[in-house]
């Protein structure tokens, strides 16, 4: 059953201290437009768009969150060229590829604002 959209405070309480990392990202990256959506499978989740282009998905969980980005082949090539992170490259190489791209997930413990900023910049560059 679909419930009403959660408030920022409710999400912060559910996620816990790690919510501060996500909030920092929202304040650091210019132009992110967020929108709450609901699905039967995932419950409430937030999307992040820049200039009407989907950049990420944020799934709040009890005591943490999952942050997902979907990368095109072009973006993955740029990530490899920039040598962003071995962990990111290995995860993308082992992830299942879909028509819309290759998903990459970070949990709250793995989420680093600087890393995600770099991934967002590469994703935007690959969409030009």
Where are these regions (language model features)?
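Well-ordered alpha/beta subsegment
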Residues: 92-128
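Short, Lys/Arg-enriched charge-dense amphipathic segments
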Residues: 1, 57-71, 107-109, 121-128
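Charge-rich, low-complexity N-terminal segments
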Residues: 1-41, 45-46, 90
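Intrinsic-disorder-associated interaction segments
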Residues: 4, 15-18, 81, 109, ...
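Short, conserved beta-strand/beta-arch hydrophobic-aromatic motifs that form part
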Residues: 39-100
């Amino acid at each position: 059953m679909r419930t009403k959209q959660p408030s920022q405070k409710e999400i912060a309480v559910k996620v816990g201290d790690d919510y501060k990392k996500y909030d920092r990202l929202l304040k650091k990256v210019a132009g992110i437009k967020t929108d709450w959506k609901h699905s039967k499978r995932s419950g409430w989740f937030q999307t992040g768009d820049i200039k009407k282009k989907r950049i990420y998905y944020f799934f709040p969980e009890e005591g943490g969150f999952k942050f997902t980005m979907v990368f095109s082949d072009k973006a993955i090539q740029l990530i490899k060229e920039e040598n962003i992170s071995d962990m990111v490259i290995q995860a993308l190489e082992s992830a299942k590829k879909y028509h819309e791209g290759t998903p990459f997930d970070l949990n709250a413990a793995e989420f680093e604002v600087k890393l995600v900023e770099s991934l967002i910049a590469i994703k935007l560059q690959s969409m030009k």
